[in-house]
């Protein structure tokens, strides 16, 4: 199955999900679905670095938040155009701003991608657990910067009023459906990319870094370049997942954007699903994401983090290769009884 | 900006007191991460657990939090030994400690924190003791007992640990396991047993550090997250596993943080430790007194 076929199938599945949603006709489905799709993107992005290269990133929340805050900054910029620019330039900028969300997603991806590139250079000196701790540090430094950056609201947070509807090609679409569709497309792109990486020379290069970086370097694998690609891609996807978030949530504050919940989820989902292939993060995030939505509605949002924690610990102990690993083992046993 | 002298001196003194407390917080990680190479990022969560135990006993029976924490030491030791046993069987034995071990402790951090939230809620809790409130005045210097007592207890604990590690047989065995596990095995000692003891001790320090924490500031379950960075920053800056280095690094960080919050505002303080950590990792990963 080549990449084109795969993305066609992925889009097909996406359309089925859409049809199902339309048939349900529940706004809540879009809200919940958006969160799950967002986790698919985050988990897949984390897995590009964590699963393929073996570098644990505890700072997912920082990349996510950077995407979200780049949107907030652009939104605020839109509000300040008249005060910052002379009258002859302002109308020109008003024609461009406010930027449509796909552009914001792209922008968030670029910002977080650059940050990811920076993180990639950290891998020059830091391996293993040191790298993991450094990413955690990176997240807190960035959070402190945002808390002290008044333009985007500082610690008070920023409000973004979500429009009720949006008009695309003459059709009036509910805004939440619009966000949902965008995230669906993003999830398809992320999964297609991850799958393409896995089957390419790049993926094999990543695997050599994961298994033995020194040996890989000795055999002529350009480890630094590969690591930089991985961190940039991973960071960019996380930023893209975060960019529409302020419009989804309506009110963004540093504590929620930089919440460790994103970090633990984007680690737990691939770990529970399985880190060696693109299916793992997908399975993990759909399962864990739905479970959390159910737990949030029926019990409380604190409990859903407890569930994530317990599942994460259980899975890393009992099933180191996740659900995908478990099923593969099962099939192997059946074939050779 | 005119910096007044007494403000500066007080900020430095407050920083030193804070640094002494940070040393107690870091002692456990210095053992587990520095000597045993176990990246226990859940350590701050155990510290918060210690705070809550001190809190419950203090509120119900009015017993001093520091005494409570000393009584709770064996329980924390046992907890640590148990965690290490699980960690060893599931990760070290299989040689998977790097990626999955990290995820394991990360999960443990969340389980502890969320369990505390479910039981106690997210309200700030505090303890009551005679030395919370009054302060000593020495000329220009103001020393609140609330900070001084934890600092002294922390230094005492730190000194005892240092004596234990350098003077006793078991302590030297722990140093040995951190240097060469195979050689220790050749001496007919069981490295796993020694590591279990050492990890037990490292978690036991969390009991005392927790009590000190809740004396210094009101505690709610997610406060621990702030300490993840501090603890590792101090540990790395001090040179992994070096106890004197850890103490110096803790004092430096305490002073720098105190100066930052005095002169730039408390909202910048968290960035100090992590900034320190990033800089150290990038430029001198061996730390101040590293090998």
Locate each region found by the language model.
Chain B
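Single transmembrane alpha-helix segments in multi-pass membrane proteins
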Residues: 7-60, 88-96, 100, 239-243
